[in-house]
């Protein structure tokens, strides 16, 4: 039995701070380790599409390649252009890195496995993602070079354009779930894949008309997430054939590494958000009442594995898009966001709102 004095210590502000710091550290370590192997998988998939082997020298099957790259970046010299604003130049990648990891504070990995279970989790995520553009703009401006500056301007326009559509899509999920708490959104989709919001959410046969709305919304959300994170085929802010490396042209060593880690953390975050909002989060595709007899920790690991498998699946789609889809022109990118996704998502918000007011759920 736990000592009452120890129990009372963890209830104090100091104990709570230590517990929260431990949770944050555990989540950061999991994200960094996941990124190391997901980045390797990304390179392997790209190589496989091109009929190459990919990284296969460092460690068995190349599994340690990402760790070798980490050491390479950390041990290199930090080169700062002579005309750059040194303070802003070094602050920009730190902001991007910090915001990318701060967003994970509200992501539920399993029942109860969340650093901060706030009731406005979706609003928090939307705010954090909106702030991410500042690091890119600061990096492009502080470099005092035309290519980084053009890349940062492209990134700002691109992120703002697609955030509007993402916001409307999130509203449709909020209307169906009746909550902005991410754990409650996942909990409302338990009971089988037919209760996931991509299929209209819980409600039996009465919710079948919602399929015509929610399936396209899930697809648009995922595509908009690619544009939001500057991933191919929407990697115009760092298009090699036009801008060399975009806003990252003048960066090297650790600052470049921070930008890259922040970018991939955001990519995995989009995969996690797609999983949570439309594909049931940590819930299994089929009812899993047998976990009721399990120990809480074992059940949590079971649900966490489902969450992680779904995230890996969407990351695979991201990697395949990079390998097989050609890059959009800038005018095509803007047209897709403003003339296709935005009007469609706005109409879908109106349809979901009407369903909530006049549909079977309202009549019940």
UniProtKB/Swiss-Prot annotation:
<keyword id="KW-0812">Transmembrane</keyword>
<dbReference type="GO" id="GO:0048038">
    <property type="term" value="F:quinone binding"/>
</dbReference>
<keyword id="KW-1133">Transmembrane helix</keyword>
<feature type="transmembrane region" description="Helical">
    <location>
        <begin position="301"/>
        <end position="321"/>
    </location>
</feature>
<feature type="transmembrane region" description="Helical">
    <location>
        <begin position="88"/>
        <end position="108"/>
    </location>
</feature>
<keyword id="KW-1278">Translocase</keyword>
<dbReference type="GO" id="GO:0005886">
    <property type="term" value="C:plasma membrane"/>
</dbReference>
<dbReference type="GO" id="GO:0003954">
    <property type="term" value="F:NADH dehydrogenase activity"/>
</dbReference>
<keyword id="KW-1003">Cell membrane</keyword>
<comment type="similarity">
    <text>Belongs to the complex I subunit 1 family.</text>
</comment>
<keyword id="KW-0830">Ubiquinone</keyword>
<protein>
    <recommendedName>
        <fullName>NADH-quinone oxidoreductase subunit H</fullName>
        <ecNumber>7.1.1.-</ecNumber>
    </recommendedName>
</protein>
<keyword id="KW-0472">Membrane</keyword>
<feature type="transmembrane region" description="Helical">
    <location>
        <begin position="120"/>
        <end position="140"/>
    </location>
</feature>
<feature type="transmembrane region" description="Helical">
    <location>
        <begin position="21"/>
        <end position="41"/>
    </location>
</feature>
<feature type="transmembrane region" description="Helical">
    <location>
        <begin position="208"/>
        <end position="228"/>
    </location>
</feature>
<dbReference type="InterPro" id="IPR001694">
    <property type="entry name" value="NADH_UbQ_OxRdtase_su1/FPO"/>
</dbReference>
<feature type="transmembrane region" description="Helical">
    <location>
        <begin position="159"/>
        <end position="179"/>
    </location>
</feature>
<dbReference type="GO" id="GO:0009060">
    <property type="term" value="P:aerobic respiration"/>
</dbReference>
<keyword id="KW-0874">Quinone</keyword>
<feature type="transmembrane region" description="Helical">
    <location>
        <begin position="340"/>
        <end position="360"/>
    </location>
</feature>
<feature type="transmembrane region" description="Helical">
    <location>
        <begin position="267"/>
        <end position="287"/>
    </location>
</feature>
<comment type="function">
    <text>NDH-1 shuttles electrons from NADH, via FMN and iron-sulfur (Fe-S) centers, to quinones in the respiratory chain. The immediate electron acceptor for the enzyme in this species is believed to be ubiquinone. Couples the redox reaction to proton translocation (for every two electrons transferred, four hydrogen ions are translocated across the cytoplasmic membrane), and thus conserves the redox energy in a proton gradient. This subunit may bind ubiquinone.</text>
</comment>
<keyword id="KW-0520">NAD</keyword>
<comment type="subunit">
    <text>NDH-1 is composed of 14 different subunits. Subunits NuoA, H, J, K, L, M, N constitute the membrane sector of the complex.</text>
</comment>
<dbReference type="GO" id="GO:0016655">
    <property type="term" value="F:oxidoreductase activity, acting on NAD(P)H, quinone or similar compound as acceptor"/>
</dbReference>
<dbReference type="InterPro" id="IPR018086">
    <property type="entry name" value="NADH_UbQ_OxRdtase_su1_CS"/>
</dbReference>
<dbReference type="Pfam" id="PF00146">
    <property type="entry name" value="NADHdh"/>
</dbReference>
<keyword id="KW-0997">Cell inner membrane</keyword>
